[in-house]
């Protein structure tokens, strides 16, 4: 039995199948941890979502910003982007079952000293605190008034965590941290403008995971979201978004032994396949 964490798939279905073949994934005895952004922008969003749902007993998936975006577009709260590849899901006969399954995925998963989250954790948060905060968002997403959450989910504010935050400001802050965070100030104020490489981070900002005395430094955090960051491997940190969508690689980390497995973007996947180039 082995557990594999897999980086952002984003509808790159054939690349996923190639990676599963490489690691010899056996759904009877193995487990997958998916870092979120399962769907969108790659050509196989419907196939990828159906595959994940059909293997739900063998995987844990946390929500990413593209997964939440799909839910908001499906409910009509935001317009689809030109780069979205979600229409096949919306037109599918099993659309409602697929979207409900997606809506009930967690924001964060913690097990045996390891944490799975899509983008990151605010440096002020301990892993235990973050798990409880993520559950607040999960209750909103799974409750009868989930429409209200999706309708007011978008926005960049507030950027600074305060324990007294309430209502949608609190839920939006938690959601943005867990699904959109890359860099912040040393005191933990989030910046959503920067999406580039480590060497290009502007003065006064730093990766969330490099903030001194980060509250979650006592656990191993596994995340994705930041494709320009590339593969990062530290004793207590693994970044697994290696840009498969952009013609890079799809990456898996076997938690037992911390071994990395990678496959190149399949020719049928990624933005080149969509653009016909």
Swiss-Prot record:
Its EC number is 3.6.1.41. It is an enzyme of class 3 (hydrolase). The keyword Metal-binding does not apply. Keywords: Hydrolase. It catalyses: P(1),P(4)-bis(5'-adenosyl) tetraphosphate + H2O = 2 ADP + 2 H(+). SUPFAM superfamilies: Metallo-dependent phosphatases. Hydrolyzes diadenosine 5',5'''-P1,P4-tetraphosphate to yield ADP. HAMAP family: ApaH (MF_00199). Belongs to the Ap4A hydrolase family. This is Bis(5'-nucleosyl)-tetraphosphatase, symmetrical. It comes from Methylobacillus flagellatus (strain ATCC 51484 / DSM 6875 / VKM B-1610 / KT).
């Amino acid at each position: 039995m082995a557990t594999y964490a897999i980086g952002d798939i984003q509808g790159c279905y054939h690349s996923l199948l190639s990676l599963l073949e490489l690691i010899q994934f056996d759904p009877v005895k193995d487990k997958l941890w998916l870092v979120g952004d399962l769907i969108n922008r790659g050509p196989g969003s419907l196939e990828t979502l159906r595959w994940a749902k059909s293997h739900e007993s063998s995987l844990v998936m946390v929500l990413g910003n593209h997964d939440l975006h799909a839910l908001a577009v499906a409910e009509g709260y935001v317009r689809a982007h030109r780069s979205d590849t979600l229409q096949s899901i919306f037109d599918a006969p099993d659309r409602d079952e697929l979207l409900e399954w997606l809506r009930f995925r967690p924001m964060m998963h913690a097990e045996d000293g390891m944490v799975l989250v899509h983008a990151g954790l605010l440096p002020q948060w301990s892993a235990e605190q973050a798990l409880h905060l993520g559950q607040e968002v999960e209750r909103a997403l799974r409750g009868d008034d989930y429409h209200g959450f999706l309708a007011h989910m978008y926005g960049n504010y507030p950027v600074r965590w305060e324990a007294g935050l309430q209502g949608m400001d609190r839920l939006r802050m938690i959601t943005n941290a867990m699904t959109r965070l890359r860099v912040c100030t040393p005191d933990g104020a989030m910046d959503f403008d920067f999406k580039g490489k480590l060497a290009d981070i502007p003065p006064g900002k730093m990766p969330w995971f490099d903030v001194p005395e980060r509250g979650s430094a006592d656990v191993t955090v596994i995340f994705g979201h930041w494709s320009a960051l590339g593969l990062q491997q530290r004793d207590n940190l693994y970044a697994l978004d290696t840009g498969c969508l952009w013609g890079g690689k799809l990456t898996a980390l076997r938690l037992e032994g911390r071994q990395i497995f990678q496959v190149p973007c399949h020719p049928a996947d990624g933005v080149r396949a969509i653009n016909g180039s």
